[in-house]
Each structure stands twice: as C-alpha cells, then as structure tokens.
Amino acid sequence: MTPPKLRASLSPSLLLLLSGCLLAAARREKGAASNVAEPVPGPTGGSSGRFLSPEQHACSWQLLLPAPEAAAGSELALRCQSPDGARHQCAYRGHPERCAAYAARRAHFWKQVLGGLRKKRRPCHDPAPLQARLCAGKKGHGAELRLVPRASPPARPTVAGFAGESKPRARNRGRTRERASGPAAGTPPPQSAPPKENPSERKTNEGKRKAALVPNEERPMGTGPDPDGLDGNAELTETYCAEKWHSLCNFFVNFWNG
C-alpha cells in the first residue's frame, strides 16, 4: 500500500495532466471545424426549416456559413418539390458580411432574407436576388444573395466514345430505310399509261385508217397496180370501137384521158 503522503503528491499532477489532454483535444476539434462550413442559427434558433411558396412548392432550406478564413460566402441551400411531383435543387450565395450591420444583427438579417424567399412563387427559378432591408442601399452593396446557375448535365458518351458520330449513323439508317422501301434492284420500272386522246383526234385517226384500208379492199387479189390507167383505156377501146378502127379509136381514147 502507498503511504498517504505519496497519494497527496500524485493527485495534483494527475489533474494537471488530464486538463492538458482535454485542452489539446478541444483545440484539435476547433481546428478541424474551422475548415468546414458550419450551420448558423436561423431566426427561429435553427439552421434549417421548411416553407410553402405561393404556388404550393414545398421547400426546405439550410443555411451554411463558411469559416472566417475561407473566401467563399454564405450559402442558402434549397430543395423544392412542385405540385406535379418534380423536384428541384438550387442555392443562393452571397457575402452578407459586407453589410456593416450584419455582425451586430445577424439573426435579424436572415429573418428578412428568408421572408423574401418565402414570397417567391418558384424559388429555384426566380433569379431575383435576396436582400435584407437591414442592408438596403449603398451600405449593403454586395451583401445580397444571388441564385447560383445550375450546371447542365454532362453529355452521354456514345459507343465509340465520340458524341459527334451519332448523327452520321442516324443519317445512314434513314438512307437504308429509303432503299428498303423503294423498288427492288433488277425489277423493270412500271410502264407509263398511254396518253389519253381527245374525241376529235380519235375521229380524225379513224377516218385516216378507213381511207387507207378502202383501196386495198376494192382492189382484187393477185392484180398489181394500174399504172397510168392503160388497162382501163384498152377496155373502152374494145367495147366501143370496131376492129378496123381499133388503133385509131385507141389513140383518141388515150388522148382524151390524157
């Protein structure tokens, strides 16, 4: 067993050692927290809350304030859900410390900012800045909070890894479809219908055809053409002239018929 004098000498040293360890741990925690944005008490004593916009958008907000050494300003993060179920996320950022009255009346500043936020019909789509009446005018220049533009989603890579190759592929598909829907290779083109004739043209053509067919029908088969009408003159001579006047009569008949 240790004597009573030794116990009395060890107790103060143990207390000092424990207190030193506690102080070192507290300093470490404070240093780690200085690099991360910490919640700031809002007008109702909390760092977050909920509200309903005039167009029935259910929104929740969270207020974050960076460390004094950080260059980024304060951020008011929002998450809203529209009546049709669509969800939106956005944030308002600014530097309220540029207002001279912010350090002394910080809670009043955020109360006025949140009041202006609740009046917006669509908080995540209204680009109007949020400004407290406490810091209106030149004394609060740069202290307003502005809507952060939302980043567009990255383009989806194609199979080959290049987004520009998707359009030519779509064009080639359209051409193959046109070829498939067109006439098959090797098939003759459809014959065009003959042009329609007018009734007057039909009658003229039919008359010409009949005139061309009549001489062929009246001419007996096996007989050739009758050049200069000599056969007809001979028949007239034999019919109307006697044998002794046959040559003279034939001469006059040929002369008359010319």
UniProtKB/Swiss-Prot annotation:
GO terms for molecular function: fibroblast growth factor binding; growth factor binding; heparin binding. Keywords: Disulfide bond, Growth factor binding, Heparin-binding, Secreted, Signal. The keyword Transmembrane does not apply. One of its GO terms (cellular component) is collagen-containing extracellular matrix. Residues 146-231 are annotated as: Disordered. It is found in: Secreted. It holds the Pfam family FGF-BP1. Disulfide bonds join 59-80, 90-124, 241-249. Residues 186-197 have a biased composition (Pro residues). Residues 1-26 form the signal peptide. Residues 198-209 have a biased composition (Basic and acidic residues). Its main location: secreted. One of its GO terms (biological process) is cell-cell signaling. Belongs to the fibroblast growth factor-binding protein family. Heparin-binding protein which binds to FGF2, prevents binding of FGF2 to heparin and probably inhibits immobilization of FGF2 on extracellular matrix glycosaminoglycans, allowing its release and subsequent activation of FGFR signaling which leads to increased vascular permeability. Interacts with FGF2. This is Fibroblast growth factor-binding protein 3. It comes from Homo sapiens.
